[in-house]
Amino acid sequence: MTSNLYYVLISPYSLAYMVQYRSVTTAAGECRGDMWAVCARISSDVTCARHANLQRSIRRCFYIRSTMCEIMLLRDHGDYPVASRMKVIVWDEELAALAKRHTQGCVPEAYKCRHTLRFWTPGQLNFEFYADKMPFTMSLISTAIKRGHMQKHNITRDIVEKYQPVGPKGNVKELALAIFDRVTAVGCGLTTWKLGGKARAFFTCNFFSENDYNRPVYKTGNSPGEKCIKKDETFKNLCFAQEPINPNEHNL
């Protein structure tokens, strides 16, 4: 019998662009968490059966997909203004640790608890999966990436210049966060478990910053990357990873 797959984006601050995550937690039995999972004690029902380090493969998946999206939007697509200072996204251990702990609580509502001294207003993706059988991890992540990428049809020039979460044709939150030029780092975590005979997964990614309402998604210019101190060697229209961008400042 063919399994029924349900992919549900469940956070108003979400982004369906998956990056590498530090480890996978496989939970035995029912997974129950607290309302603020990051701040509170992790549910005693969560027992870690194994950990798998998937950094390299997931990082590559996100790096290629997101950067291709950035290049498409900011260089090759005539409907959008070019970005003058957008850098490649790097992995952050603190964001990953917060995301991993959040998924172990199995509760998506944790906006308040992801604020830290380094990250004043971090963005977040929450992605929930349930089906008869658990797919391969990369298949699950790839599906979420594609869902977010398809929002390119909903983003307009007006939204780039003055961010709103919904455009004339639908939601833009996920993709808008992917191309937000204050997002310079990300960290993710994934927990999987069984519930009522069904396979469940909860995936969270935390980002350096989130979009500000009515402010630009990114700073524009006459040519891509014209305000970069140095360009990335592979993706010529993006700034290199050490570009000094403060995620806690606002675009004007």
Swiss-Prot record:
- UniProt-listed Gene3D superfamilies: CAP
User: Where, by residue number, does the polypeptide cross the bilayer?
Assistant: none
Query: Which GO molecular function entries does the Swiss-Prot or TrEMBL record give?
Result: toxin activity
Q: What is its main location?
A: secreted
A GO CC term? extracellular region
| Domain SCP: from-to ranges | 63-207
Q: Where is the signal peptide?
A: 1-23
Indicate which residues form the motif Cell attachment site.
32-34
> Which family does the entry's similarity section mention?
Belongs to the CRISP family.
**Function statement:** Inhibits platelet aggregation induced by all agonists tested (ADP, arachidonic acid, the thromboxane A2 analog U46619, thrombin, and snake venom snaclecs (TMVA that activates platelet through GPIB, and stejnulxin that specifically acts through GPVI (GP6))). May act by competing with fibrinogen for binding to glycoprotein IIb/IIIa (ITGA2B/ITGB3).
Per its record, how is this protein called by name?
Answer: Tabinhibitin 9
Whose protein is this, by species? Tabanus yao (Horsefly)
